[in-house]
Regions:
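C-terminal alpha-helical cap of glycosyltransferases
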Residues: 369-385
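Donor-nucleotide binding loops and adjacent catalytic segments primarily
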Residues: 32, 40, 47, 57-62, ...
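Active-site-proximal region of nucleotide-activated glycan assembly enzymes
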Residues: 6, 38-43, 67-70, 130-195, ...
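Acidic donor-binding loop of glycosyltransferase active sites
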Residues: 111-113, 279-294, 302
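C-terminal "capping" alpha-helix adjacent to the active site of nucleotide-linked donor transferases
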Residues: 327-334, 338-355
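An amphipathic, basic-hydrophobic alpha-helix
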Residues: 81-113, 131
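Conserved nucleotide-sugar phosphate-binding/catalytic loop shared by glycosyltransferases and other
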Residues: 7-15, 38-94, 181-183, 336
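A short, well-ordered alpha-helix in the C-terminal region of glycosyltransferases
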Residues: 355-369
Length: 385
């Protein structure tokens, strides 16, 4: 006689950027995989923003998640900004309607638990969970907790963080609920696809010149793009440069995009090939958003980090970069240090294979042996049962 499967329902909440979505989908995939091995059936729903870019990013991601998620549910989503804006007042109405939508959706779905991956869209579902007495987990990907995590942490069953030191940023009364998990990364980043990356880039295996991957993000990073353009002669002489510029920079600088050759390969954006391209790289020059940072870290790639530190940022990228710098796992260029001379100094150091190996060894220690996605999925499944 076949044993009846236990059936659970889990709701995921998060959005705003791919950094809140892709890691969550990785957890959803792993949770489904783990459930099968435990003879458990899980129905997963995702709550995200109903409007603008947020919805399109989430829905595009859900299409490629392998069927792990049953449905996407859009809610109104406001935002509390760190500066004065009239929209702070109008967004209060969005937050209210987002809460009402979350409350009735969760009451209908009756989930066993909710997993919050962050972004302000996760706040109202977590508040509704608290009212409905639905247990929820919240995960913080950055070194310092963001506003959404701080708001969600009080009622959370478990607070999952990427770094042990992050615990110190929470109230002492909450620290017993904290679990250090690392930041979840899609499994494809753990696979050795460097040959596929070289093939995509048109770089033969016989070419021994170090590959420098420059990540400006999907929207681009003007500071990083300018550093590359200003030092292109030096870079091409010493490296094969793979430059993801972002669409805006590509549209505004067609001559640069057309100037590609065997030593300089500009791309507006690299899509599904990104995991294999990172694996093919020897050095990465990048911002220090949590998602891209950990994608490079789990592949043990030496990094030069140029964190975003404008007035519109809470400084999370600086904190992330400083952590890796202090662990001897990356160079950091911030403020007055983000100059051509400093960049070249860092690159000259990383031309030494021994130095690159030192950074790689430090990254392996940071990331640990257990995959964060497995640790998180295990915690969620264990708490449900």
């Amino acid at each position: 006689m076949l044993e009846n499967k236990k059936k659970f329902c889990v709701v995921f909440a998060g959005g705003g950027t791919g950094g809140h979505i892709y890691p969550g989908i990785a957890v959803a995939d792993e949770l489904q995989s783990l459930a099968k091995s435990h003879n458990v059936e899980i129905e997963i729903h995702w709550i995200g923003s109903s409007s603008g870019m947020d919805r399109s990013i989430v829905e595009k991601s859900l299409v490629s998640c392998g069927g792990s998620i049953t449905a996407f549910h859009g809610i109104a989503c406001g935002k509390l900004r760190r500066y004065f804006s009239f929209r702070n007042f109008t967004d209060l109405f969005k937050i209210f309607f987002g809460f009402i939508s979350s409350y009735f959706l969760l009451k209908k779905l009756k989930p066993n638990c909710l997993f919050s991956k962050g972004g302000f869209v996760s706040v109202t579902p977590c508040r509704a969970c608290k009212l409905l007495k639905i247990p929820y987990f919240t995960h913080e990907c950055d070194f310092t907790p963001g506003l959404a995590t701080r708001l969600n942490s009080g009622g959370a069953k478990k607070i999952l963080v990427s770094y042990e030191e992050t615990s110190g940023y929470f109230k002492e009364s909450l620290r017993s609920k904290i679990c250090v998990t690392g930041n979840p990364v899609r499994p494809v980043f753990y696979e050795d696809n460097s040959s596929a990356g070289r093939e995509f880039l048109g770089i033969p295996e016989t070419n021994s010149k170090p590959i420098l991957l420059v990540l400006g993000g999907s929207l681009g990073a003007l500071q990083i793009n300018n550093l590359v353009v200003e030092n292109l002669d030096y870079l091409k002489k010493n490296f094969i440069v793979i430059h993801q510029t972002g669409k805006k920079f590509a549209d505004e600088n067609p001559k640069i995009m057309e100037s590609g050759d065997e030593f300089y390969k500009p791309y507006a954006f690299i899509y599904s090939q990104m995991p294999s391209v990172i694996q093919a790289a020897d050095i990465v020059l990048s911002r220090s958003g949590a998602n891209s940072l950990w994608e490079c870290a789990v592949t043990s790639k030496p990094m030069i980090l140029v964190p975003l530190c404008s007035n519109g940022s809470r400084g999370d990228q600086v904190d992330n970069a400083k952590y890796f710098k202090d662990k001897n796992a990356a160079f950091m260029l911030v403020g007055e240090d983000a100059t051509s001379d400093k960049l070249i100094e860092c690159l000259e150091s990383l031309k030494d294979k021994t130095k690159r190996e030192q950074f790689s060894d430090s990254l392996k220690i940071i990331c640990g042996k257990e995959k964060p996605v497995s640790r998180i999925a295990g915690i969620v499944l264990e708490e449900m049962q």
